[in-house]
Amino acid sequence: VYITNAGDITLSPKGVEMAHVNNVRLYVHGERWTASQPGDWGSQWQVEAPIFVDHGYVSQDCYYPIIKGRSVITNQGFVTAVDLGIRRVNNNWGQAIIRVGSAEACPAAGHPNAVFEFHYDGTFYSPGNGHFNDVYIRSDGRLKINKKELENGALEKVCRLKVYTYDKVKSIKDRSVIKREVGIIAQDLEKELPEAVSKVEVDGSDVLTISNSAVNALLIKAIQEMSEEIKELKTPLFTKIARKISKYFKF
């Protein structure tokens, strides 16, 4: 350990500088780490990191931050904290959590607290809306096997679906209202097109979700059926009669 007259501290285990601390920052020489690591995905399960926090044994339902930051606007307040940590739930793998919210009081006191969840299976949960330039969903035909064209009846399915206006609440347990929305109900869609509905677990409760891609496909099929019906309505009467006669007589 080296300490300068200016108060800077350098950590140099075995004579190799690993970290430098002064009154404004902590600097870690990550290149020392990379020089001794393969950097492959396969071994990451057993690899630590230049800065490593081991929480050890914890309870079945808990959350502990790994790193946290906080700031406050001068003369205004709004003390806000952001942290990254690990959440544990009973009998399951952990979740990575990014939490953004008030550092003045708890959510029960009415202060904001957004929790973003990253699950071990790749699932991501956000408590609010997502705003993107665009969203692309994999739909390459080479990724789809056992294809079968959807049978007629899509128009009837769409007509049976009801559109509601409703208040959207945060979760099954937290009934506080997020905002007023308009849309369809997953349980209704499941009766008509079960492939469009999936079930996920949120805070210990099963919640139904809807695939917009599947709904769009159903609407496309319904429009195609409606187009055929319109064509039939526009067909002259004598043409319809000729079609029926042609089924019984060959000319």
UniProtKB/Swiss-Prot annotation:
Gene Ontology CC annotations of this record: virus tail, fiber
PROSITE patterns: ICA (PS51688)
Region (Interaction with the receptor-recognizing protein gp38): 134-137
Source species, domain of life: Viruses
UniProt subcellular location: Virion
Keywords assigned by UniProt, alphabetized: Host-virus interaction, Viral attachment to host cell, Viral tail fiber protein, Viral tail protein, Virion, Virus entry into host cell
Any one Gene Ontology BP term: symbiont entry into host cell
Main location: virion
Pfam families membership: Peptidase_S74
PTM text: Proteolytic cleavage and release of the chaperone in the host cytosol stabilizes the folded protein.
Family the entry assigns: Belongs to the S16-like long tail fiber protein Gp37 family.
Name of the protein described by the UniProt record: Long tail fiber protein Gp37
Source species of the chain: Enterobacteria phage M1
